[in-house]
Swiss-Prot record:
Organism of origin: Cronobacter sakazakii (strain ATCC BAA-894)
One family name in Pfam for this protein: TruB_C_2
GO biological process: mRNA pseudouridine synthesis; tRNA pseudouridine synthesis
Family note: Belongs to the pseudouridine synthase TruB family. Type 1 subfamily.
Function: Responsible for synthesis of pseudouridine from uracil-55 in the psi GC loop of transfer RNAs.
Annotated EC: 5.4.99.25
Gene that specifies this protein: truB
Catalytic residues as annotated in Swiss-Prot or TrEMBL: 48 (nucleophile)
Source taxon at top rank: Bacteria
Name listed for the protein in its UniProt record: tRNA pseudouridine synthase B
Amino acid sequence: MSRPRRRGRDVHGVLLLDKPQGLSSNDALQKVKRIYNANRAGHTGALDPLATGMLPICLGEATKFSQYLLDSDKRYRVIARLGQRTDTSDADGTVVEERPVTFSEQQLQDALESFRGDTLQVPTMFSALKYQGKPLYEYARQGIEVPREARPITVYELLFIRHEGDELELEVHCSKGTYIRTIIDDLGEKLGCGAHVIYLRRLTVSKYPVERMVTLEQLNALLEEAQTRDIAPSELLDPLLMPMDSPAADYPVVNLPLTSSVYFKNGNPVRTTGAPSEGLVRVTEGEAQKFLGMGEIDSEGRVAPRRLVVEYPV
């Protein structure tokens, strides 16, 4: 007889986790889900186990809007080891080639310049992108290389921080879908010495404030404090959450009057003033501007529902 499924609570929002090194993004997600006793949870844009930094964890209804964070810009600090190339392009892999580091500082600056702006990037085999339904890393672990299409990316900023011996430190502000490991591997090839990532930290995702990041240690400490004070953990944990609509913060807002919002919530497109002429919009209602979900301007200029919040009783 199967054990009845444990019922969590309906908690909605985005936690900005400072993911520790050595933990997979999914393991970090499960820890946060347990700490919050949440019914649903999902992360937006995995970080490698080697990487640390901002990992937005969406809880409850916020999971419906996590896809919009996948499209956002990100900023990283990375340290590369020069002179060694690995099969995964980071320190978790096996060294497959060693070469002397002989480039000049001018050659380094010229190489860095070639990565700035709009470029095409061939994703690493050690990635979660899928080929014929399977993640690329599953093929890579079997020693199989499959064709990958080059994808357009944008590197808005590539800042040189330091070059000391066989270490090179950079800061990268980039578009969605950019693999920092691939940038470092490609840079190593351009410099003729090979390179791989030994340190990677995601500094920011979209416009989320860095000061709102929290660690697993801080979350567990709050759990202990709640137990000591004999209060519900939610009293200490829930104030850490960003609003459930924050993943879609970059989209324009359309506020519907209560007379129109009832139709919108029932799945019908509605006409309203002040809406853009096209594209996705964040829809709110009334004076309180309560978030209803995402809409899209249809061919008749109406706001059509695309993804709505389920209204839970308080």
